[in-house]
Amino acid sequence: MMVAHTAQQLDLREKLLTNGVHSLSDIELLAVFISSGNNKKSCLQLAYELTKHLGNLRNILNADLQSFKSIHGLGEVRYAQLQAAKEICHRSDFIHLQKEIRLSNTQQTYAFLKKRLRDYKNETFAALFLDNQHRIIAYEELFSGTINTATVYPRPIVERVLQLNAAALILAHNHPSGLSDASQQDLAITERIRDALDLVDARLLDHIVIGDNEVYSIFAENKWVCN
């Protein structure tokens, strides 16, 4: 049985190396990641069961440890590796953002913020800190709350602006409900933060609300579909 499993793993790796990573299905990609099975299940079978249980790659990447471990043969080591791979992708995106993005490229900025915030189960409030040329200095997640609210204070934001010597920033937060409409509370905190930043000569460029597949710009009062 183990010989058959090993041959299966080698076949998948050969397919990837010969035909390219895009030639693999979602389940095959997961199987390559899982790498090895056990005496009873191959890596392909484990990948199939994980996909059947959680539905799709997005759900798998955002699953908690207990959901992941519910598939017999998958444990903390594979889960830790999966989370590390996810964070590597996030950091790679940010490197690109730092090098390439200016304020004029709003779609890429929105796409980056959506990737970072969309799948959080609790409302999370973040900021992109910019220099006076609107180049990215840092991305930081500043506040985290419950499923439908996060308490946000202007003072720590202003302090961080001064520490980073930022000239401007873009705020963003997610709505775990999936809806990107800005609430009255969102509008009120935006105004408070903008007024606080004015006191230190920093400019609030926008506040973005992240839904499931949409982002809403409070300053532009527009929605964009952002898959």
UniProtKB/Swiss-Prot annotation:
Give start-end ranges for motif JAMM motif. 173-186
Signal peptide residue numbers = none
The record's listing under CDD domains reads: MPN_DUF2466 (cd08071)
Query: Which parts of the sequence belong to the MPN domain?
Result: 102-225
An example Pfam family from this entry, by short name, is UPF0758_N
Determine if Hydrolase is one of this entry's keywords: yes
| Origin superkingdom | Bacteria
Record-linked InterPro entries = MPN, RadC_JAB, RuvA_2-like, UPF0758, UPF0758_CS, UPF0758_N
One GO biological process term is: proteolysis
Q: Does the keyword Hydrolase apply?
A: yes
**Which terms does the record give in the GO molecular function aspect?**
metal ion binding; metallopeptidase activity
Residues bound to Zn(2+): H173, H175, D186
Q: Which UniProt keywords apply?
A: Hydrolase, Metal-binding, Metalloprotease, Protease, Zinc
Task: Spell out the family assignment given in the record's similarity comment.
Answer: Belongs to the UPF0758 family.
Q: Which PANTHER family match?
A: DNA REPAIR PROTEIN RADC (PTHR30471), UPF0758 PROTEIN YEES-RELATED (PTHR30471:SF3)
The protein, known as: UPF0758 protein lpg2489
Lineage, please? Bacteria, Pseudomonadati, Pseudomonadota, Gammaproteobacteria, Legionellales
